[in-house]
Amino acid sequence: GRFGGGGSTARSGGVVYAGGGSALQQHAGYADDREQMFEYLRMEVRDAVDETLLWRFCEQSLDQLEWLEALGVPFPPTAVSPRKTSYPEDACTLYFSGNEAAAPFCDGARPAPRGHRVAGAGRTGSVLFGKLRAATAASGAEIRTRCQARRLLTTPNGDVEGVEILELRAPPAIHRLHAMLFELGSWGAMFSPRLVAFCQRSIAALERRWGRALRIRARGGVVLCAGGFAFNTAMMNEHTGWFRVARPLGTLGDDGSGIELGRSVGGAVGEMSRCSAWRFISPPTALTSGILVDHSGQRICNEEFYGGTLGQRMALCEG
């Protein structure tokens, strides 16, 4: 990766969405199955995800969870978070992470908590990614950081046969500065757009000075695994409407470069206007007993909705 690895996953809450009767669900006394999970998710995603793919996700959910546990990702059985919350306390590893218990979703599918939180103190995305990284290293795969994918290499008939990267070949002090600017720009995004722009320019300058272009040939294809484009002002202005005025959440790696690489060789894109802008009103849970209204006094939605849904409904309000 261009930076140190992990991206937004390493900064996340470490919540894995899984269901169908996991050990944690059974321990907490919840009967769940793949069919109920599918019905709920179908209401959530609507036509954004092909139903065949959605069913495969539900069908393989428990296998994925067991695979993570086999890699050492900790999901010890605990009590379900006892209240509506945006993120559970350290003592909980299972909670209602979406709209499962909120109407109208609970009318169409039996509610069950499916947010499996990696055990640990605070946000545990770093624990999740740490285990994945360790397993990757143990497999013998070569891990390269401070390497930016710049261009996909193609054959005359358009097949992708490799990738051109820009590797930061610099003294340790420059690597530390590169990492510091990444952290500063990623965390500072909530406070200062100018700081983000400064860090982006500084990182680009370091890469121009110390970067070395390399070409890597691929025998079995190239997999693009990158973030969104919350930190790309031009793409936000082009695609996202009102969301463009919100402060970006993620890391400086969410610059849309992976999307643009795919498009450069004819890849199709969709749902580019979709954004997740969270607005949590609980805790305190007392606020969910109130009525959330728009500028004209009309109720916006069920106040117990997940923060991502709540934020989206608020953003769609006129005025």
What is the role of each PLM region?
Residues 9, 48-53, 67-85, 268-275, ...:
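A short alpha-helix-loop-beta-strand transition element characteristic
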Residues 16, 160, 299-300:
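Hydrophobic "anchor" residues
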Residues 1-13:
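Glycine-rich FAD pyrophosphate-binding loop
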Residues 20, 167, 226-227:
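Glycine-rich, N-terminal phosphate-binding loop of Rossmann-like dinucleotide-binding domains
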Residues 259, 268-319:
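An anion/pyrophosphate-binding glycine-rich loop and adjacent beta-alpha core
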Residues 56-212, 233-234:
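Conserved redox-cofactor binding core of oxidoreductases
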Residues 16-57, 69:
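Glycine-rich active-site loop/strand segments that organize a redox cofactor
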Residues 171-280:
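Glycine-rich loop(s) and the adjacent beta-strand/alpha-helix scaffold that form part
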